[in-house]
């Protein structure tokens, strides 16, 4: 896999607060190689390491996108949800940004059944089919559709398991990460100083609580995916 230039610079990461970790009492000792200092009771992430692993992740997603691979971006906490949706839509990726339903990947047949139901209900709504039902039945199906939209709206076009999963906040999305590990799906994780860097295929040490930090990391990955997709379109 060829290395490329992704315009990752330390000043930009400093401005976004990528270097701020968790309090020194809330840390995982395995993160020691990725921490450069302690300041006012918090750990400071080594941004040189961040840049290195972010660059490796960009190389990986570019290469995968250039081969037509599918991506899933996961980030369900409030500070990540909007950034995840925007990044995924921009890069034409699937996403989960509300709640991870246990077994979403490991019990794929059940997820697939839910997606079929979701698509059927959307079609019924668009064609006016729901309005022709008795009010009670229509109300029940509309509530069901609303719930499916909330939890499955970001994966409504997913027809198979993703090739790569990008996870914002390893701690928050641990269930999703374990499912990927079980299935052998490669993962890229944004990890803070309280995480285990050995669980993902590529771990990017960074502040997973600041919106600006999350947005910056996702933006770099999105640019790489989009460039890879363009390469795939030009050379299918």
From Swiss-Prot:
PANTHER family: 30S RIBOSOMAL PROTEIN S2 PROKARYOTIC AND ORGANELLAR, SMALL RIBOSOMAL SUBUNIT PROTEIN US2M. It is found in: Plastid, Chloroplast. HAMAP family: Ribosomal_uS2_B. This is Small ribosomal subunit protein uS2c. GO terms for biological process: translation. Keywords: Chloroplast, Plastid, Ribonucleoprotein, Ribosomal protein. Disulfide bonds: none annotated. Belongs to the universal ribosomal protein uS2 family. Its main location: plastid. GO terms for molecular function: structural constituent of ribosome. CDD domains: RPS2. PROSITE patterns: RIBOSOMAL_S2_1, RIBOSOMAL_S2_2. InterPro entries: Ribosomal_uS2, Ribosomal_uS2_bac/mit/plastid, Ribosomal_uS2_CS, Ribosomal_uS2_flav_dom_sf. Coiled coil: none annotated. One of its GO terms (cellular component) is chloroplast. SUPFAM superfamilies: Ribosomal protein S2. It comes from Gossypium hirsutum (Upland cotton).
